[in-house]
Amino acid sequence: MATPAGLKEYSVADLKKATKNFRADTLIGEGGFGMVYKGWVDEETLAPSSKWGIGMPVAIKKLKPEGFQGFDEWQKGSLENHLFRRYNNPLSWDIRLQIAIGAARALAFLHNLEKKVIHRDLKTSNILLDENYNVKLSDFGLAMRGPFDEEAHVTTRVMGTYGYVAPEYLIYIYIKSDVFGFGVVLLELLTGLRSFDANRSHGQQNLVDWLKPKLSVKKKLRTIMDVRLEDQYSARAAFQVAKLALKCLEPNPENQPSMKEVVEVLKEIEAMEEETINSKV
């Protein structure tokens, strides 16, 4: 099977070597589609480390066939597929807003449970869509259940996906770690670009590092919007989404909005767009 440029292909033997044959003491979580194990690879070659515990830690998922039961009802697949597989019918602006609101509501629900839940691996591939573009979050293999207070919790577990996690969240657990990930997803919805792409030019590979400075300037925002969205959005609404993404991407969790607040802002933006459309009729 052909491997896309920039991606490394691993055999089952490689994965077994990296995880000590999926030994129980390397298990770090379980999601709907399988078990998540901690493994180690060489930092330069990315080959399985010759000695476990040396090199770069990675999260490796071992899929289980039954994990796909019930997947058929989410006929549209993942948000990742629609944004980056270049389908003939790219997601429209209003659908992107709908998806953002759905994902934000799901996270707000988790964060406001009596025993709060942090997803810890929010990304476009974990946002599933049904035929009406309703959202379901998947893959809770790295999720943690509270109660959590406002203080950070230290963890030795691998968490999150590169490009969706702020550096400080690699060691500490905050309820707001999901908020940062959501900010990255908003940026991907705006631009149609992946959070990380090794094929992009140096300095542009990490989407947040590259484009975050442009989010607060209207004229610059226009230059980074997904070209497939041309004439579908108002500049005012796009700028409001960009400002919300910027707040979510704040390095200090204390300055980030809660997911409940994110939902409220997105609903206001959606109403703003509907008002704009109605005024043109």
Which residue ranges define each predicted feature?
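Conserved eukaryotic protein kinase-like
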Residues: M1-V281
